[in-house]
């Protein structure tokens, strides 16, 4: 077992096609945009420049995260490292909001309801019908999951509940060996992990935004608590600007 500090890197996928269209995405499996691919490559360059070279990758079952990780690792010359994938790192399931325009949803339901669905810790959107065109209930990649485990909607609390077992059972053991661990995932699965790491309250987590494509580096002590709360973005100025853009997503036309 290696001694602390343990090195953890979090990377939200680059801009996706539905990010660009301002649509709720959730479990819908969309591709990166050209901009998103460039963000991923730049993320790998930032890792290489900082000397933060991952030894193992953990990612979701969704192509936007998988592709981001591939591009970043290729850019950092680490494409050869072991890869572990889990549905537990998937984006939050947005229920009946999946495929809907964020600005139109805001206009239809009002800011209070919109923000409750989008940012509250424990209020999920209405469930998505299992025969809906944007449902993943019968997707073959989830065939081994019991039906009661496959979500029809989720709040952030649900994401934390399904993500934390993977943190403790799969990511922590890699950290304990001294590996530098890269987690390439999604806005909400990473928000849930940061909530756990930094001890953010259920109320305050609503204000946390994670930008696309900019690595967030943590050094963790022997109890897996951050030596620097909030970690360190490898491009702080770009992260600050991107976080403001994420905040304003619902306001786009």
Swiss-Prot record:
PROSITE patterns: PG_MUTASE. SMART domains: PGAM (SM00855). Pathway: Carbohydrate degradation; glycolysis; pyruvate from D-glyceraldehyde 3-phosphate: step 3/5. GO terms for biological process: gluconeogenesis; glycolytic process. Keywords: Gluconeogenesis, Glycolysis, Isomerase. Substrate binds at residues 12-19, 25-26, 64, 91-94, 102, 118-119, 187-188. Its EC number is 5.4.2.11. It catalyses: (2R)-2-phosphoglycerate = (2R)-3-phosphoglycerate. The keyword Isomerase applies. Transmembrane segments: none annotated. Pfam families: His_Phos_1. The record marks 186 as: Transition state stabilizer. One of its GO terms (molecular function) is phosphoglycerate mutase activity. The keyword Isomerase applies. Belongs to the phosphoglycerate mutase family. BPG-dependent PGAM subfamily. Catalyzes the interconversion of 2-phosphoglycerate and 3-phosphoglycerate. This is 2,3-bisphosphoglycerate-dependent phosphoglycerate mutase. It comes from Streptomyces griseus subsp. griseus (strain JCM 4626 / CBS 651.72 / NBRC 13350 / KCC S-0626 / ISP 5235).
């Amino acid at each position: 077992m290696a001694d602390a500090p343990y090195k953890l890197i979090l990377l939200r996928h680059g801009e996706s096609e539905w990010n660009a269209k301002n649509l709720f995405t959730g479990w819908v499996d969309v591709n990166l945009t050209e901009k998103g691919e460039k963000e991923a490559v730049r993320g790998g360059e930032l890792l290489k420049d900082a000397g933060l070279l991952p030894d193992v990758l953990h990612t979701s079952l969704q192509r936007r995260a998988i592709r981001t990780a591939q591009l970043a690792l290729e850019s950092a010359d680490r494409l050869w490292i072991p890869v572990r994938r889990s549905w537990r790192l998937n984006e939050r399931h947005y229920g009946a909001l999946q495929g809907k325009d964020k600005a139109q949803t805001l206009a239809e339901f009002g800011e209070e309801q919109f923000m409750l669905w989008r940012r509250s810790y424990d209020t999920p959107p209405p469930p998505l019908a299992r025969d809906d065109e944007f449902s993943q209930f019968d997707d073959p990649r989830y065939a081994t999951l019991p039906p009661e485990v496959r979500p029809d909607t989720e709040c952030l609390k649900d994401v934390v509940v399904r993500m934390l077992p993977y943190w403790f059972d799969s990511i922590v053991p890699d950290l304990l060996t001294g590996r530098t661990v890269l987690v390439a995932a999604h806005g909400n699965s990473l928000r849930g992990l940061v909530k756990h790491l930094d001890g953010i309250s259920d109320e305050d987590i609503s204000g946390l935004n994670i930008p696309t494509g900019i690595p967030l580096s943590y050094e963790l002590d022997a109890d897996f608590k951050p030596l620097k709360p909030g970690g360190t973005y490898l491009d702080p100025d770009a992260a600050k600007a991107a976080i403001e853009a994420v905040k304003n997503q619902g306001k786009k036309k």
